[in-house]
Amino acid sequence: MTLFDLILIAISLSMDAFAVSICKGLSARKVSLQHATICGVWFGGFQFLMPALGYFLGDRFAALLTKFGPWIAFVLLALIGASMIKESFGGDEQLDDDYSAKAMLPLAIATSIDAFAVGVSFAAMQMDILPAAGLIGVITCLLSAIGVKVGAMFGDKYRAPAERIGGIVLILIGVKTLLTGLGVL
């Protein structure tokens, strides 16, 4: 596998985290560099961790994750998306400025489950996992931080409709993940 191939894989894996980061930026009252960094570290960290786990533990958990991973991602993203849509009708006092571990952990897990499967395939190809997972993590970190700022630019002017769209996007990502996992897509 070439470096170019790996970069394309990293960008592809980071798209869900990028979309969720945009949603976080949309729904925050005031976005700072700290918020962008938090999203980048959480999503980039999990996008680094999951391929490594898939590489080392894939034989033991691949079947289980293949069976339940899409459902887990769907439920987490659908619940968070529905909550965003609901909160968008509540006014500014309902804005989501929560970048705590409790808020970020389910998002990081939901957006990185597919990276576990990539790690399993990397093991089958006998790739050197640390540089590969590192590149995936760094690209996801950067794109996620950018996503928060992009979301904030639109959120300031179009907060309620943008938050509704963000919630719908999260639900659609969950549905896509589920349908892909079930072999429909």
Predicted region positions:
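Structural signature of hydrophobic alpha-helical transmembrane segments
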Residues: 2-18, 67-77, 129-143
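Juxtamembrane transmembrane-helix termini in multi-pass membrane transport proteins
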Residues: 3-59, 123
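Selective transmembrane alpha-helices of multi-pass membrane proteins
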Residues: 9, 63-89, 158-185
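Short helical (or helix-break) motifs at transmembrane helix termini and adjacent helical loops
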Residues: 13-24, 84-87, 113-118
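Hydrophobic/small/kink-forming positions within alpha-helical transmembrane segments
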Residues: 14, 44, 48-52, 56, ...
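C-terminal ends of transmembrane helices
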Residues: 21-34, 82-95, 144-160
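Hydrophobic alpha-helical transmembrane segments in multi-pass integral membrane proteins
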Residues: 49-55, 112-124, 171-185
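Alpha-helical multi-pass membrane helix bundles of inner-membrane/thylakoid proteins
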Residues: 67, 82-110
